[in-house]
Structures are given as structure tokens and as C-alpha cells.
């Protein structure tokens, strides 16, 4: 599982890893938030209504879910279990709470936290995305500082200063984990 603060680069890193490793899969999560520019339903997220989210939650379709920043996000249970059953490595994009929950259910899960090079760089990235107003950026920045304080709950940390180097470091972790004696 890969976690990072908003603007930390986790989505871009995961997309690049998926292109480089054919055994890696990333089940598409569900969300109630509206799509951002260039996001497509079914590729980036399954964009659903709050009512649909509640229906699926009641039905047990989600492995875990959270509600950061007022919008709901969930990890699809069936897609993950199907991928694991086929021997695929699953990479998930989760917040700190979701990662902790999944680790309890899947003891062999590997938790990786992607750090920004600095808090100042993170603030600049959040502003540069132009997707949130200053109040929302402030909320995301505050949560990022809180989440970074939980770094000790993760197995690895990767600094995303140089994108190519961060991708290589993530690939190295995935490779090392395949050969780890458990």
C-alpha cells in the first residue's frame, strides 16, 4: 500500500509502476467526490453518488472506506480478493487510516509512505494543482503534517523529490519484498 499526503505524487507514481510491472494491479477505488480535470470514470475512480456509496457499503462491497475532506473513498473488496487469488501483486492508494486497517486484515501487506522533499515543496504542489481553494489547501496541509507524524507505522518511506528516483526506489522495495523470507 502506498500512502502520501495530497500532492505527494502517489497517483503518478502508482500509474508509472503499473506501466513497468505487468504483475502489479491497482483496483479502481470508489469515491463520491466529483472528477478532477482529465480524470475518467472507471479509470481513475468509480465516481458514484453518496446514495450509491451507502448502498454498496451496506452490501459489504468495500474492504475499507474513509471520509477525508468531506468526500467518501472506498477500496473494492471483490477486485482485490480476485487479484490476490490470481497471484497478482496489488498496489493500493490509501490514507494512513485505510493503510492501518488493511494491515490488520492482511498481515503481509507492505506499507510505503511517499514523502515530499519538504513541507514547503508540498504546499507549492498543492497550490500548483489548482484544484482546491486556499481553505481546502490549508486543511490538506494540516492533515499532511499529522499523517507524516505517523510515519513509524509504515515499513518504508520514499522521498519524492526526483520522480524517476522515487519510482526506482518503489520498484526496489517491491522486488525486495518478493524475495523476503517470511
Task: Map each language-model feature to its residues.
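Hydrophobic anchor at the beta1->P-loop junction of P-loop NTPases
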Residues: 2
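ATP-binding Walker
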Residues: 7-8
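Walker A/P-loop
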Residues: 11
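The feature captures the helix immediately C-terminal to the Walker
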Residues: 14-15
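Post-Walker A helix-loop "phosphate-sensing" segment adjacent to the P-loop in P-loop NTPases
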Residues: 18-27
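ATP-dependent small-molecule kinase phosphotransfer cores
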Residues: 29-90, 97-100
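Conserved phosphate-donor/acceptor-positioning beta-strand/loop module used by diverse small-molecule
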Residues: 90-95, 104-129
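NTP-dependent small-molecule kinase module
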Residues: 124, 128-132, 146-182
Amino acid at each position: 500500500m502506498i500512502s502520501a499526503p495530497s500532492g505527494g505524487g502517489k497517483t503518478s507514481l502508482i500509474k508509472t509502476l503499473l506501466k513497468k510491472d505487468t504483475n502489479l494491479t491497482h483496483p479502481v477505488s470508489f469515491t463520491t467526490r466529483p472528477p478532477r480535470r482529465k480524470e475518467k470514470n472507471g479509470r481513475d475512480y468509480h465516481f458514484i453518488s453518496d446514495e450509491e456509496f451507502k448502498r454498496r457499503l451496506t452490501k459489504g462491497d468495500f474492504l475499507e472506506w474513509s471520509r477525508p475532506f468531506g468526500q467518501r473513498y472506498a477500496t473494492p473488496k471483490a477486485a482485490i480478493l480476485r487479484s490476490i487469488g490470481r497471484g497478482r501483486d496489488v498496489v493500493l492508494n490509501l490514507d494512513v487510516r485505510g493503510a492501518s486497517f488493511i494491515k490488520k486484515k492482511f498481515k503481509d501487506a507492505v506499507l510505503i509512505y511517499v514523502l515530499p522533499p519538504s513541507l514547503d515543496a508540498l504546499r507549492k504542489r498543492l497550490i500548483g494543482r489548482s484544484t482546491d481553494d486556499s481553505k481546502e489547501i490549508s486543511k490538506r496541509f494540516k492533515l499532511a503534517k499529522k499523517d507524516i507524524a505517523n510515519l513509524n507505522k509504515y515499513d518504508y518511506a520514499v522521498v519524492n523529490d526526483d520522480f524517476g528516483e522515487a519510482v526506482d526506489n518503489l520498484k526496489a522495495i517491491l522486488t525486495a519484498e518478493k524475495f523476503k523470507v517470511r
